[in-house]
């Protein structure tokens, strides 16, 4: 079947056939994908991004073609804000409910974006759709992930980094958790995605992960590549997308100029079910330390109100991290991969208050590198505890460690390495397009 697709019909004008990158998520999930797409397009490869409608302006502003994929994570988090202490399985059930409603549209949307593609790249929760499209359309694929999902004896669990078991038990637990996650989505994926594409069900064991090539968009300086990963798994460095044409408001510039570099406090795309309580805790901690701070409300992690000392705090909705972080002394955030990357690249320490997902893992990695105190539990967080972490993060020792690590990260080019790896694998040469068996999500 593939041999027919690689005949003269495919080779004629196939250099113009697009690469399709599919992803769903928050800004922290989508911006790295756009950075990777820009890198590919700068090498002469037309790129389409298949993602949710709310990111269409960002995709188009960066010169990439946009195709819609049902799935609005901002709306999902607004409807179901993350409560402090909420269990991982409660989050998973909520996620399954939304996936079930979104996935009905995916086969037709995927065909529209990918039917004439020459390479598919799956990211995050869109990976399993891309695998099915690859099988149905006989198009090569690769996975590009933002957190380490490949099983290893040496990596802590992404969701529970503090839980470590002896080698074989640790690997077994990872497989068991993956199996549980698959069972949660099995009916939805087999029924809503694979059946409309004319594919058989994956089966009770779920997708096979043993042969897929995977690019990881984070730095080995933060999370070293495990020695038990095969060569088909490569860590490239962070994929960072600079903000285009952003002008800071005059009031922000005035605040920055009025005193020593402030702290940044913001939780990005996270929405707190009790944002007022968290905001009160943050302001009380700042009064204890006497430090100046920028309070970024984001999607709803903090609340902007008038009960703020204008000399000590400045409230803003958003500012690009690549512009703002070099101007602050440390960042208090949720621990998303993109925010961690921005803080590290700027050479500033972090204080991490995870909301869930992969955030405890990145908080663990930052603490292991000496550029953040141990993660703080959001549930019951007290001002005194946060104030102590702020003092730790702004200590000369931690600031020096962050500056040294930031220098190493600034010497990396994760996008260039990812593109070079795809070229080395032969996936960007028409002659090298040979579909590998892929029944998976990495």
Model-assigned labels for residue ranges:
Residues 2-65:
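N-terminal subdomain of nucleotide-sugar transferases
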Residues 2-5, 116, 379, 383-442:
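C-terminal amphipathic helix plus adjacent low-complexity
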